[in-house]
Amino acid sequence: MVPKLFTSQICLLLLLGLSGVGGSLHAKPRQFTRAQWFAIQHVSLNPPQCTTAMRVINNYQRRCKDQNTFLRTTFANVVNVCGNPNITCPRNRTLHNCHRSRFQVPLLHCNLTNPGAQNISNCKYADRTERRFYVVACDNRDPRDSPRYPVVPVHLDTTI
């Protein structure tokens, strides 16, 4: 019985890892905490146009990311959303650490227009701006994160 249970647990962990529950197949670069990577990918008061803004993300991941959303607000404002009531994450219903913003913020959506680009310096994006609410997943900070915020955003789940 024990070997079967142990094998089942390993299979479950592998399945969770591949399905993205434990993280994305396009994981964050190792030098960043989840909160730091969230900030790089999703928080910018005045992001440049998408093609320029996405270069930083694509250089770290060594690929053209299909799409990305920048919240035009401060990291501190997103941290404050982590204090809103917990909700089930709309895009991953197994997670219950999401929080919805109380206010709409300006967003910049970036969509890759040339998915066949062989070189990351050739990634091109279409820009779309709008104002929306957003939902973020939050976790306790990593020891490498600033002690200023005990709970930090780690994932942009959706915009509403």
From Swiss-Prot:
<keyword id="KW-0540">Nuclease</keyword>
<dbReference type="GO" id="GO:0050830">
    <property type="term" value="P:defense response to Gram-positive bacterium"/>
</dbReference>
<keyword id="KW-0255">Endonuclease</keyword>
<keyword id="KW-0964">Secreted</keyword>
<feature type="glycosylation site" description="N-linked (GlcNAc...) asparagine">
    <location>
        <position position="92"/>
    </location>
</feature>
<feature type="disulfide bond">
    <location>
        <begin position="50"/>
        <end position="110"/>
    </location>
</feature>
<dbReference type="InterPro" id="IPR023411">
    <property type="entry name" value="RNaseA_AS"/>
</dbReference>
<feature type="disulfide bond">
    <location>
        <begin position="89"/>
        <end position="98"/>
    </location>
</feature>
<dbReference type="InterPro" id="IPR036816">
    <property type="entry name" value="RNaseA-like_dom_sf"/>
</dbReference>
<dbReference type="InterPro" id="IPR001427">
    <property type="entry name" value="RNaseA"/>
</dbReference>
<dbReference type="GO" id="GO:0003676">
    <property type="term" value="F:nucleic acid binding"/>
</dbReference>
<dbReference type="GO" id="GO:0006935">
    <property type="term" value="P:chemotaxis"/>
</dbReference>
<feature type="active site" description="Proton acceptor">
    <location>
        <position position="42"/>
    </location>
</feature>
<feature type="signal peptide">
    <location>
        <begin position="1"/>
        <end position="27"/>
    </location>
</feature>
<comment type="subunit">
    <text>Interacts with bacterial lipopolysaccharide (LPS) and lipoteichoic acid (LTA). In vitro interacts with phospholipid bilayers.</text>
</comment>
<feature type="glycosylation site" description="N-linked (GlcNAc...) asparagine">
    <location>
        <position position="86"/>
    </location>
</feature>
<keyword id="KW-0944">Nitration</keyword>
<dbReference type="GO" id="GO:0005615">
    <property type="term" value="C:extracellular space"/>
</dbReference>
<dbReference type="InterPro" id="IPR023412">
    <property type="entry name" value="RNaseA_domain"/>
</dbReference>
<feature type="region of interest" description="Required for nearly all of the bactericidal activities; partially involved in LPS-binding">
    <location>
        <begin position="28"/>
        <end position="72"/>
    </location>
</feature>
<feature type="active site" description="Proton donor">
    <location>
        <position position="155"/>
    </location>
</feature>
<keyword id="KW-0378">Hydrolase</keyword>
<keyword id="KW-0325">Glycoprotein</keyword>
<protein>
    <recommendedName>
        <fullName>Eosinophil cationic protein</fullName>
        <ecNumber>3.1.27.-</ecNumber>
    </recommendedName>
</protein>
<dbReference type="GO" id="GO:0004540">
    <property type="term" value="F:RNA nuclease activity"/>
</dbReference>
<feature type="glycosylation site" description="N-linked (GlcNAc...) asparagine">
    <location>
        <position position="111"/>
    </location>
</feature>
<feature type="disulfide bond">
    <location>
        <begin position="64"/>
        <end position="123"/>
    </location>
</feature>
<feature type="binding site">
    <location>
        <begin position="65"/>
        <end position="69"/>
    </location>
    <ligand>
        <name>substrate</name>
    </ligand>
</feature>
<comment type="similarity">
    <text>Belongs to the pancreatic ribonuclease family.</text>
</comment>
<keyword id="KW-1015">Disulfide bond</keyword>
<dbReference type="GO" id="GO:0002227">
    <property type="term" value="P:innate immune response in mucosa"/>
</dbReference>
<comment type="function">
    <text>Cytotoxin and helminthotoxin with low-efficiency ribonuclease activity. Possesses a wide variety of biological activities. Exhibits antibacterial activity.</text>
</comment>
<feature type="disulfide bond">
    <location>
        <begin position="82"/>
        <end position="138"/>
    </location>
</feature>
<feature type="modified residue" description="3'-nitrotyrosine">
    <location>
        <position position="60"/>
    </location>
</feature>
<dbReference type="GO" id="GO:0004519">
    <property type="term" value="F:endonuclease activity"/>
</dbReference>
<dbReference type="Pfam" id="PF00074">
    <property type="entry name" value="RnaseA"/>
</dbReference>
<feature type="glycosylation site" description="N-linked (GlcNAc...) asparagine">
    <location>
        <position position="119"/>
    </location>
</feature>
<keyword id="KW-0732">Signal</keyword>
